[in-house]
Curated annotation (Swiss-Prot):
Entry-linked HAMAP family: Oligoribonuclease
Alphabetic keyword roster: Cytoplasm, Exonuclease, Hydrolase, Nuclease
Pfam families: RNase_T
Known EC number: 3.1.15.-
Function as written in the Swiss-Prot or TrEMBL entry: 3'-to-5' exoribonuclease specific for small oligoribonucleotides.
UniProt similarity note: Belongs to the oligoribonuclease family.
Name listed for the protein in its UniProt record: Oligoribonuclease
InterPro entries for this protein: Exonuclease_RNaseT/DNA_pol3, Oligoribonuclease, RNaseH-like_sf, RNaseH_sf
Amino acid sequence: MAADANNLIWIDLEMTGLEPDVDRVIEIATLVTDQELNIIGQGPVIAIHQSDDVLAAMDDWNQKHHGESGLIDRVRASQMNEAQAVAQTIAFLEQYVPKGASPMCGNSVGQDRRFLNRYMRELEDYFHYRNLDVSTVKELVKRWSPETMAGFKKQNTHQALQDIQESIAELQYYRSKVFKI
């Protein structure tokens, strides 16, 4: 498949917390859609090894959710570091989207971009500087059409691949209910 500048890169990171100065990335997943939001490619879903000290520093919320999902065990067992995760992810993306063409797509991608900028700069540089943030649309719908919110429920698994799939489904829902284009 030839890379297409109209395709969209969807990304989600799971982190040990919300502060890039102290927390680390522990999982990354990517999907590519065409401009109509049809999934055309699934990238690698990678648990990124972090030390026991990094994992032990997680707050209770992260310990609970990442423990229950099995992510902490996957991170401990992983032999993949951040540089390897970046290389594998970019190798996947190059098949579908030229460098610099796609905005960063997902939910609260500003947070993901902060971590990419700190720990995975080469991957952050692969994206256009713009964001396609589903959480922005959600906040607008919540204020301007609150009745529409009841029609879409997220599972909130806090697993990177499932979170991206939900983000795409959520934008598809808003497109069908809110946007008349």
